[in-house]
C-alpha cells in the first residue's frame, strides 16, 4: 500500500511539473510573424517604465536651482535636437549622426499577447487603474494589443475577452515606474503630458488625469482612433491658446467643452493680455481650467507647438500648486524631446545647421519664455516669499481671480 502511495505521489509530481510553464517557453509561444509589429511583451506581474526612457533619464539625473537661469543640462541628453552626433546606441560619436526625428515625447509602449483564434470573433480589452477604466474594441483574429500612455507608479489590471463567448484570452496585472505621464494620440498629436505627478514643497502631489498640456490638437493630427483615445483618457475639454491666424472655432473632438481666448504670444505679454471686454486672457484660461476640473473633465490645453504659450500657462498652474520653481524649469525643458514642429518650428530656420543637417532646440530654461516668466513671478513674491505666493499675487491683483477660486483649485488638484 505504501509503495502504491509513493507511485501516485511521483506521478502527480510529474504531471504537475509538465503543466507548469517555463517563462521563457511561454514568451517564445508569442513570437513569430503574428507578433513582429507588436511592442515589447508585457507579462502578468511585470514592473515596467511608463515614461520614455530618455525623458526619464533627464528627469532623474538633473537638479536645477531656484532663481538661477544661467545654466541648462538638457543638451547633454539623447533624444532631442542638440546637433550632437550619436552612434546607434545613443552614445556621442564623431562617426555617428545627429538626431533627425525625435520621438522621445512618446511614452513607452508594451503589448499584451494571446494565442491567435480567428474563429472566436471580436474581443474587448479592459485596462484598469485605481482612478480610470479604459476599454478598447479589437477585431477578430487579433492576437495582441499595444498599450501606452501609462501613468507612472500605478498598479494596473487587464483582461482581454472574446465578445461572443466571454472566454478570457489574456488577463493579469502589472505596475509602472517613472516620473512623467506622457500621452500620445494618433495619428500625430505630439508633445503631450499630464501635469500630474509633480511633488509640492509641502509634500503633496498633483493629481493625474486632471490637466494635460501638449501640441496642437486639430483634425489634421487626430485620427478617428486618436479621438477615441482622447475620450478614453478622460479628457472632456479643450483649451486652444493660439492666435487669430490658426485658432480653432470649435473642439477637435465632438462633445468636448471648448475655450479659445485668442492669445498671440507667450511670456509676460500673455500674462498681461486683455481682451476687448477688458478681461485678462490668462484669467479666461484659469477659469476654464478650474471649471473643467470642478466638473470632472480632464482638460487638454495647447498652442501650436505646445511650447511658449503652453509653457507659460504650465508654469502658472503648477507654480500655483506649490511645485518648486527648479522643477518647473525641468518640466518646461521636456519639450526638447519632441519632433520638428513641436520642439522647434520649421519657420525658425536660424536654428538649422546645414553642415550637420540638424536642428537646435533653443527654448531652454536660460531663454525666453522661461527666463522671463519665472523672474516675473518671483518679483511679485517679494523678499522671503515663495514662488506659489508670487503666482497667487499675480492672479489676484493682476488677472482678477478671486481667492476662493484659487483655494478651490488647490483643493481639487492636490492629494
Question: Where is each model-derived feature located?
Answer:
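Residues at the beta-strand->loop junction immediately N-terminal to the Walker
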Residues: 302
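Residue-level detector of transmembrane insertion/anchoring sites
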Residues: 10-11, 203
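C-terminal motif of bacterial Sec signal peptides marking the signal peptidase cleavage site
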Residues: 15-18
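Cys-dependent protein tyrosine phosphatase-like superfamily
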Residues: 20-299, 313-415
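Sec-dependent signal peptide recognition
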Residues: 2-10
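Ser/Thr-glycine-rich phosphate-binding loops at phosphate-binding pockets of nucleotides
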Residues: 305, 309-310
Amino acid at each position: 500500500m505504501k509503495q502504491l502511495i509513493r507511485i501516485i505521489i511521483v506521478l502527480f509530481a510529474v504531471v504537475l511539473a509538465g503543466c507548469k510553464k517555463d517563462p521563457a517557453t511561454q514568451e517564445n509561444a508569442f513570437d513569430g510573424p503574428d507578433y513582429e509589429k507588436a511592442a515589447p511583451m508585457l507579462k502578468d506581474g511585470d514592473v515596467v517604465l511608463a515614461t520614455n526612457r530618455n525623458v526619464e533619464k533627464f528627469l532623474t539625473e538633473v537638479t536645477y536651482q531656484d532663481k538661477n537661469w544661467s545654466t541648462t543640462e538638457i543638451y547633454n541628453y539623447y533624444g532631442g535636437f542638440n546637433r550632437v552626433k550619436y552612434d546607434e546606441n545613443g552614445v556621442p560619436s564623431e562617426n555617428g549622426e545627429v538626431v533627425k526625428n525625435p520621438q522621445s515625447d512618446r511614452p513607452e509602449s508594451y503589448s499584451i499577447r494571446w494565442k491567435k483564434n480567428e474563429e472566436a470573433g471580436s474581443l474587448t480589452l479592459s485596462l484598469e487603474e485605481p482612478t480610470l477604466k479604459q476599454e478598447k474594441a479589437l477585431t477578430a483574429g487579433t492576437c495582441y494589443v499595444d498599450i501606452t500612455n501609462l501613468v507612472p507608479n500605478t498598479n494596473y489590471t487587464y483582461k482581454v475577452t472574446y465578445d461572443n463567448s466571454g472566454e478570457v484570452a489574456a488577463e493579469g496585472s502589472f505596475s509602472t515606474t517613472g516620473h512623467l505621464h506622457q500621452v500620445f494620440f494618433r495619428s500625430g498629436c505630439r508633445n503631450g503630458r499630464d501635469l500630474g505627478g509633480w511633488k509640492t514643497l509641502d509634500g503633496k502631489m498633483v493629481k493625474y488625469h486632471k490637466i494635460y498640456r501638449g501640441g496642437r490638437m486639430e483634425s489634421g493630427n487626430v485620427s478617428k482612433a486618436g479621438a477615441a483615445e482622447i475620450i478614453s483618457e478622460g479628457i472632456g475639454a479643450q483649451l486652444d491658446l493660439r492666435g487669430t491666424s490658426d485658432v480653432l472655432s470649435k473642439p477637435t473632438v465632438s462633445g468636448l467643452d471648448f475655450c479659445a481666448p485668442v492669445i498671440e504670444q507667450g511670456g509676460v505679454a500673455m500674462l498681461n493680455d486683455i481682451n476687448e471686454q477688458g478681461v485678462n486672457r490668462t484669467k479666461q484660461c484659469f477659469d476654464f481650467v478650474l471649471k473643467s476640473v470642478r466638473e470632472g473633465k480632464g482638460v487638454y490645453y495647447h498652442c501650436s507647438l505646445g511650447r511658449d504659450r503652453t509653457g507659460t500657462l504650465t508654469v502658472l498652474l503648477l507654480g500655483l500648486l506649490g511645485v518648486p520653481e527648479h522643477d518647473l524649469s525641468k518640466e518646461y525643458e521636456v519639450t526638447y524631446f519632441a519632433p520638428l514642429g513641436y520642439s522647434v518650428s520649421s519657420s525658425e530656420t536660424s536654428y538649422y545647421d546645414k553642415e550637420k543637417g540638424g536642428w537646435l532646440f533653443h527654448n531652454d530654461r536660460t531663454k525666453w519664455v522661461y527666463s522671463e516668466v519665472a523672474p516675473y513671478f518671483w518679483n511679485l513674491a517679494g523678499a522671503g516669499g515663495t514662488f506659489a505666493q508670487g503666482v497667487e499675487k499675480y492672479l489676484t491683483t493682476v488677472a482678477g481671480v478671486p481667492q476662493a477660486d484659487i483655494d478651490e483649485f488647490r483643493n481639487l488638484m492636490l492629494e
